[in-house]
């Protein structure tokens, strides 16, 4: 998936799931399943419920996404 095709939205983490997946609520109220991007996994960036994150969504499947950034609180 080329980066230019991805839709980036802000979200809030609702719960942590197994295998580095998270249920997040988008700013428009929808809930999607998101996993951590590779660079966040390599650098051990911790994500906890309640954190604000940036999520990339594919235009082909809007129910799944990738967490690419955690905002500093």
Curated annotation (Swiss-Prot):
Gene name of the encoded protein: infA
UniProt-listed PROSITE patterns: S1_IF1_TYPE
Subunit structure: Component of the 30S ribosomal translation pre-initiation complex which assembles on the 30S ribosome in the order IF-2 and IF-3, IF-1 and N-formylmethionyl-tRNA(fMet); mRNA recruitment can occur at any time during PIC assembly.
Species for this entry: Dehalococcoides mccartyi (strain ATCC BAA-2100 / JCM 16839 / KCTC 5957 / BAV1)
GO cellular component: cytosol
Record NCBIfam families: infA (TIGR00008)
The family this protein is said to belong to: Belongs to the IF-1 family.
PANTHER family linked to this entry: TRANSLATION INITIATION FACTOR IF-1, CHLOROPLASTIC (PTHR33370:SF1)
Top-level taxonomy: Bacteria, Bacillati, Chloroflexota, Dehalococcoidia, Dehalococcoidales
S1-like domain residues: 1-72
Keyword list, A-Z: Cytoplasm, Initiation factor, Protein biosynthesis, RNA-binding, rRNA-binding
Protein name (Swiss-Prot/TrEMBL): Translation initiation factor IF-1
Compartments where located: Cytoplasm
Principal subcellular localization: cytoplasm
Classification via HAMAP family: IF_1
Keyword Cytoplasm: yes
């Amino acid at each position: 998936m080329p980066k230019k095709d991805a839709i980036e939205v802000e979200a809030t983490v609702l719960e942590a799931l197994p295998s580095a997946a998270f249920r997040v609520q988008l700013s428009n109220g929808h809930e999607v399943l998101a996993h951590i991007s590779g660079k966040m996994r390599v650098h051990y960036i911790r994500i906890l419920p309640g954190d604000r994150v940036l999520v990339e969504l594919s235009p082909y499947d809007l129910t799944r996404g990738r967490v690419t950034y955690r905002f500093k609180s």
